[in-house]
From Swiss-Prot:
It comes from Kluyveromyces lactis (strain ATCC 8585 / CBS 2359 / DSM 70799 / NBRC 1267 / NRRL Y-1140 / WM37). This is RNA exonuclease 4. Residues 1-13 have a biased composition (Polar residues). Belongs to the REXO4 family. Signal peptide: none annotated. One of its GO terms (cellular component) is nucleus. The keyword Calcium does not apply. Residues 23-38 have a biased composition (Basic residues). The gene is REX4. Residues 119-271 form the Exonuclease domain.
């Protein structure tokens, strides 16, 4: 911020108020005269500023600037590790996830939090196939349990040649295909995990279509279709996972390469953040469901 010339003049005139002393500690005659003139000018200047209200405005501007600087410094401190390294969004997400996991795990047995349980969250990543890579092909599937622990994480080998890895958004690279499974094998493993369980996802029908699988509607909880989320954060339209995670969890995801594990965890956290309302609306549509364990 560049201060006005009036503010600089006020600083300069204020500095001239300091009494200059000679080596013996006595005031010089010339300095005394200068001080008298300076005090008069300062008084006239300040009186003029008070009359016009300019001085108070400048002071308010400086105070606001100091407050903004303090906010920036506070945010920088919050986003910095003890060793001075900046915390990226993935680190922050992992930190919050671990905190929430610890809150849940403290109330449950270890076998329960590590097991698959009744609730799972799934997310998929895709690569480009066909001319110019415009068509999408499944390349990774990740499933986590109610507590965010990984249940299944598979890289999938597309049947068609990959023409665009879309690494900048999918996070998929050629070397991931070294241990990739076929789509048929992936489909079988995912089907076994989903059977009899409540599936949490974001626009999950896209992922199910890519897997060529179906799942009972009464067993699906889709954060993209949850009406309270749509009304509050997207004016009734379909909100993005990134937007919901930012608005509700105060976390930034998908800033660079996507991670299907990270997205699946974020989706589960979103569901848990409004679980009671999810189930209330779901029961209105499909009728009361049997109590389920996590």
């Amino acid at each position: 911020m560049v201060l006005s010339s009036n503010w600089l003049s006020l600083q300069k005139s204020t500095d001239s108020d300091s009494v200059n002393k000679n080596k013996g500690g006595k005031k010089t005659k010339s300095n005394s005269k200068k001080r008298t003139v300076s005090v008069k000018k300062d008084k006239q200047y300040v009186d003029k500023k008070k009359k016009n209200g300019t001085g108070s405005k400048i002071m308010d501007m400086v105070a606001n600037m100091n407050r903004e600087i303090a906010k920036v410094e506070q945010e920088r401190t919050k986003n910095t590790h003890a060793d001075g390294q900046m915390i990226n969004s993935e680190d922050r997400f992992e930190s919050v996830l671990k905190q929430k996991l610890n809150e849940d795990v403290a109330k449950k047995s270890l076998s329960r939090t590590n097991g698959v349980g009744k609730y799972v969250s799934m997310d998929c990543e895709f690569v480009g196939v066909g001319p110019d890579g415009k068509d999408s092909a499944l390349a990774r599937v990740s499933i986590v349990n109610y507590y965010g622990n990984v249940v299944l994480d598979l890289f999938v080998r597309p049947k068609e040649p990959v023409t665009d890895w879309r690494t900048w958004v999918s996070g998929i690279k050629p070397h991931h295909m070294a241990n990739a499974v076929t789509q048929e094998d992936c489909q079988k493993q995912v089907s076994n995990v989903l059977k009899g369980r409540i599936l949490v996802g974001h626009s999950v029908h896209h992922d199910l279509t890519a897997l060529m699988l179906s799942h009972p509607r009464r067993m699906i909880r889709d954060t993209s279709r949850h009406m309270p989320f749509r009304q509050k954060y997207s004016e009734g339209k379909t909100p993005s996972l990134k937007k919901l995670t930012k608005e509700i969890l105060q976390l930034d995801i998908q800033d660079g390469e996507h991670s299907s594990i990270e997205d699946a965890r974020a989706t589960m956290l979103l569901y848990k953040s409004d679980k009671l309302e999810f189930e209330k609306l779901h029961n209105k549509q499909f009728g009361p469901s049997k109590p389920t364990q996590e």
